[in-house]
Amino acid sequence: MAVHKEVSFVAYLLIVLGMFLYVDALGCTKECGNLGFGICPRSEGSPTNPICINCCSGYKGCNYYSAFGRFICEGESDPKNPKACPLNCDTNIAYSRCPRSEGKSLIYPTGCTTCCTGYKGCYYFGTNGKFVCEGESDEPKPYMSTA
């Protein structure tokens, strides 16, 4: 019976230790990153406040619509590796809808953001402008007042 209790205790200890290691692996380190800026594709514009963009320079994953709600195109430019696109505005495009719609599109300066603490769906670049990583953390939801 004593052997059974020892095995149970060792198994329990291994499980608890494993949980601590797993939780610790999910945590981000506290040191600051050396990132230059971040780009987070966001929904922009509206039928009454149009944006100046074209399909080539629009972000992949974002859809672009006319003032009447007609789908125009999906963006073609990858923030990690932007295309060389003309600078003209497509006057048919009024607004975009992107998977992430809250917060800033351009994060500069990045402060103490690291790849671990950066938001999923945001792309982070070094001070030399080269792509470093995509963020790994879930973006907090904006606080909604119930009053």
From Swiss-Prot:
Sequence repeats lie at residues 25-81, 82-141. The keyword Repeat applies. Keywords: Disulfide bond, Protease inhibitor, Repeat, Serine protease inhibitor, Signal. GO terms for molecular function: serine-type endopeptidase inhibitor activity. Disulfide bonds join C28-C116, C32-C112, C40-C122, C52-C89, C55-C73, C56-C85, C62-C98, C115-C133. The record marks L87, N88 as: Reactive bond for chymotrypsin. Residues 1-25 form the signal peptide. Pfam families: Prot_inhib_II (PF02428). The keyword Repeat applies. It comes from the Eukaryota. The record marks K30, E31 as: Reactive bond for trypsin. Belongs to the protease inhibitor I20 (potato type II proteinase inhibitor) family. This is Proteinase inhibitor type-2. It comes from Solanum tuberosum (Potato).
